[in-house]
Curated annotation (Swiss-Prot):
Name of the molecule in the record: Large ribosomal subunit protein uL11
Similarity-based family: Belongs to the universal ribosomal protein uL11 family.
HAMAP family: Ribosomal_uL11 (MF_00736)
Database matches in Pfam families: Ribosomal_L11, Ribosomal_L11_N
UniProt-listed Gene3D superfamilies: Ribosomal protein L11, C-terminal domain (1.10.10.250), Ribosomal protein L11/L12, N-terminal domain (3.30.1550.10)
UniProt keywords, alphabetically: Methylation, Ribonucleoprotein, Ribosomal protein, RNA-binding, rRNA-binding
Processing and modification events after translation: One or more lysine residues are methylated.
Function statement: Forms part of the ribosomal stalk which helps the ribosome interact with GTP-bound translation factors.
Molecular-function GO terms, alphabetical: large ribosomal subunit rRNA binding; structural constituent of ribosome
Subunit record text: Part of the ribosomal stalk of the 50S ribosomal subunit. Interacts with L10 and the large rRNA to form the base of the stalk. L10 forms an elongated spine to which L12 dimers bind in a sequential fashion forming a multimeric L10(L12)X complex.
Source organism: Xylella fastidiosa (strain Temecula1 / ATCC 700964)
Any single biological process term in GO: translation
Amino acid sequence: MAKKVTAYIKLQVKAGQASPSPPVGPALGQRGLNIMDFCKAFNAGTQKIEQGLPIPVVITAYSDRTFTFITKSPPASILLKKIVGIQSGSKRPNTEKVGKVTRKQLEDIAKTKELDMTAADLDAAVRTIAGSARSMGLVVEG
């Protein structure tokens, strides 16, 4: 018989830095899941990703207090800020530009996020990422 799913927990945890402190501890603790098991498994699973990069994770909690989790690619805004070298996007993106991004850089980000996006092809994914860049106050070249 299949295990009964009791909850889906969505979090953003820094790669290789999962610890029992918030947001991980309270989210898993209130569902009765073993926090340290998740932290060890998550940190082992994100070893190859740059440390400190926020990684979205979806944890599936089961009725017998076990869990599984799926990690996703980092948010596009984080990747864009990293490539351009800025701390935050523009407060007024239509009038105040904070940096430039090329089509090649957008393609690299789209390839990284390809599995998590619903875009039909790479070009559609690039257009989606370009929209995110524009809304952050970045100039899209190419």
